[in-house]
From Swiss-Prot:
This is Defect at low temperature protein 1. GO terms for cellular component: membrane. Keywords: Membrane, Transmembrane, Transmembrane helix. Residues 1-14, 69-348 are cytoplasmic. Required for growth under high-pressure and low-temperature conditions. It is a multi-pass membrane protein. The lineage of its organism: Eukaryota, Fungi, Dikarya, Ascomycota, Saccharomycotina.
Length: 348
């Protein structure tokens, strides 16, 4: 705004202010004069009451009119849509206000473009995030939108009603026992391993917090719960495999690591027998295949040598024929010995 515009604006505002002051001063003369005359009359009390009452009524009526006007103005604004932005001269006659509104709209537009995609991955507790919203530095282990609370409940119900995390053992416990009671009975009371006891206590504490706290389950809590469950499963599996291995003879070449992939302890012996049978059959078949290949090579070499000898038969004498016949007989003898030796190996 130029200097002349500012001078005109402040002159206008100053004139309005002075006019209001004179209006209030002239309006106050009448009630003051009325009160003064009433106080000097012969009936002071009645006159004063009438004058003061009239002034009070006038003030109350003015207040009612002002409040009513404000309420009516607010009711009119309710009909205006909330997303409506007053940016025209009709809506906002004051140009400075319109410019502020326009600048705010432009700034909001720029910020919405900048922050349309969050800077960090958005991971809400209680459910596994989709791959597009997950942290790329973390390996995707669980399926998308997995409900942590439902998964923990299913694990607890399986252990409670079936007595197992996996099909490695059977527990005969009271059906009224809780998940915590069963874990405590199996891994704390009847166990001497200190590490297993500590992890079982952590599992019980974490389970009660996740199930009954009412707070959403975070990914870290769920992963820790699953790790504790897997630890107890591996302990149970190893324990039962060790018990079954004691049933085998001492000369059996077994190691616990061969069964660390979830092999059922009750099927170890049958699988061992099947493995031995497979090994014997495989070895015999391999020897037979090698023997057949050797015999085929022998026949092919013999035929080639006989062909060469026949081609040379026309250019040699009788003495050479006898030498050739003797060499052929020696070759047949050596071939028969090779065949007998491989047959002996197969029988063994």
């Amino acid at each position: 705004m130029t200097g002349i515009s500012l001078l005109w604006l402040w002159s206008k505002r100053g004139f309005i202010f002075i006019s209001y002051v004179f209006l209030v001063c002239f309006a106050a003369v009448l009630p003051i004069d009325s009160i003064a005359q009433a106080s000097q009359s012969s009936n002071n009390a009645l006159n004063t009451f009438i004058v003061v009452g009239a002034l009070v009524i006038f003030a109350v009526v003015c207040i009612i009119l002002i409040v009513g006007r404000s309420l009516y103005f607010k009711s009119c604004l309710q009909d205006v849509p909330r997303r409506y932005i007053p940016s025209t001269a009709i809506d906002l006659p004051h140009r400075g206000s319109r410019e502020l509104v326009t600048q705010g709209v432009e700034a909001s537009k720029q910020l919405s473009t900048m922050f349309i995609k969050p800077k960090d991955p958005v991971i809400h507790p209680g459910v596994e995030p989709p791959e597009r919203c997950d942290d790329p530095n973390i390996d995707k282990v669980f399926p998308e939108y997995l409900n942590y609370h439902s998964c923990i409940k299913n694990i607890a119900d399986r252990f409670k009603y079936k007595g197992v995390f996996m099909s490695v053992d059977k527990n005969k416990l009271d059906i009224d026992s809780t998940f915590s009671d069963i874990v405590r009975e199996k891994y704390i009371i009847s166990n001497e391993n200190v590490a297993v006891k500590q992890n079982a206590e952590r599992l019980i504490e974490l389970y009660e917090v996740l199930r009954f706290s009412g707070n959403p389950i975070t990914r870290e809590q769920f992963v820790y719960f699953v790790e504790l469950c897997i630890y107890l499963v591996e302990h149970s599996l190893t324990h039962h495999i060790e018990e079954d291995l004691t049933k085998f003879p001492s000369n059996t070449m077994f190691s616990i690591g061969e069964f660390s992939t979830g092999l059922q302890a009750s099927r170890i012996q049958s699988r061992y027998s099947a493995a031995q049978s497979f090994e014997n059959d495989f070895g015999e078949n391999l020897l037979n295949a090698q023997l057949s290949e050797l015999l085929q090579n022998k026949s092919r070499i013999e035929e080639e040598r006989l062909g060469r000898l026949r081609r040379l038969a026309g250019s040699i004498n009788e003495s050479e024929d006898e030498a050739i016949s003797s060499s052929i007989s020696r070759w047949n003898t050596s071939s028969g010995s090779i065949t007998n030796s491989y047959s002996t190996v197969v029988r063994h």
